Amino acid sequence: IMGHMVNAIEQVDEFLNLGANAIEFDIDFDKDGIAQITHHGIPCDCGRKCTKKAIFTEYLDNIRQVTTPDDPELREQLVLLALDLKLQRISSAKAYRAGEDVAKKLLDHYWQRGNSRARAYILLNIPLVEDYEFIRAFKDTLKNEGYESYNDKVGINFTGNEDLDKIRDVLEILGIHKQVWQADGITSCFARGTERLKEALEKRDTPGYNYINKVYAWTLVRKSIMRRSLRLGVDGVMSNNPDRVIKVLKEKEFADKFRLATYNDNPWEKFRG
């Protein structure tokens, strides 16, 4: 269960208390591709305040504590951090610079270049395939800085509901054949059909297809849509209301089929139910 738009530091506890075991937050860049703040802005989901924010590096410092064993701030349940990268707000020419910057800030403030024991998995949410240079830069930077091992903790996810074959082609260009999630969804203000979601699930379940390991639906607020997504076999849901998802998961139909992921689970492996 991914808590959606958790952009203020005080919201982290709020969403975890509602039952989320993953959080998504928005990264806003300046015109040069430097990550500045966690901030969504207007418009955003119905019934939500769009303007909450924090300085990105301070947010990382806080979330490091929340995901570090034996830290007083530890919240054991939080296993995944989804960085919603607002690259569509800057020139595609700055995507590489943005990738370098986010990698360095994670190295300095989250992983602390090997001195941190923070253990959450990181999902890089890229809005459009045209911004794929962000991924190249991120990986180049880890390599150049001597921390390629952190690649094991990082997954890739394109969130713009683009053609799945087009996404596969870009992953092929980047040489990425693992640790790939696929999102499908729309703002909670609107309804969305299931055609593309079903296609993504079908590809996930195709033997030998290495470009989708997990599929999740966003942003779900109605229990009927949560049930529909679970029946289709999604790996996760993003919601403004994690407590509603918890209630649905406890229903007889789903209680034996789904559970919340923990650190004993590998987020990059296809689930074989």
From Swiss-Prot:
Residues engaged in binding Mg(2+): E24, D26, D84
UniProt-listed GO biological process terms: killing of cells of another organism; lipid catabolic process
Similarity annotation: Belongs to the arthropod phospholipase D family. Class II subfamily.
Keywords from the UniProt entry: Cytolysis, Dermonecrotic toxin, Disulfide bond, Hemolysis, Lipid degradation, Lipid metabolism, Lyase, Magnesium, Metal-binding, Secreted, Toxin
Cofactor note: Binds 1 Mg(2+) ion per subunit.
Cellular localisation: Secreted
Role this protein plays: Dermonecrotic toxins cleave the phosphodiester linkage between the phosphate and headgroup of certain phospholipids (sphingolipid and lysolipid substrates), forming an alcohol (often choline) and a cyclic phosphate. This toxin acts on sphingomyelin (SM). It may also act on ceramide phosphoethanolamine (CPE), lysophosphatidylcholine (LPC) and lysophosphatidylethanolamine (LPE), but not on lysophosphatidylserine (LPS), and lysophosphatidylglycerol (LPG). It acts by transphosphatidylation, releasing exclusively cyclic phosphate products as second products.
Keyword tRNA processing included in the entry's annotation: no
Disulfide links within the chain: C44-C50, C46-C189
Protein name per UniProt: Dermonecrotic toxin SdSicTox-betaIIB1bxiv
Record-linked Gene3D superfamilies: Phosphatidylinositol (PI) phosphodiesterase
EC number(s) recorded for this UniProt protein: 4.6.1.-
GO molecular function: lyase activity; metal ion binding; phosphoric diester hydrolase activity; toxin activity
Keyword match Lyase: yes
Active site residues per record: H4, H40
Domain of life assignment: Eukaryota
Tissue: Expressed by the venom gland.
Organism: Sicarius cf. damarensis (strain GJB-2008)
GO cellular component: extracellular region
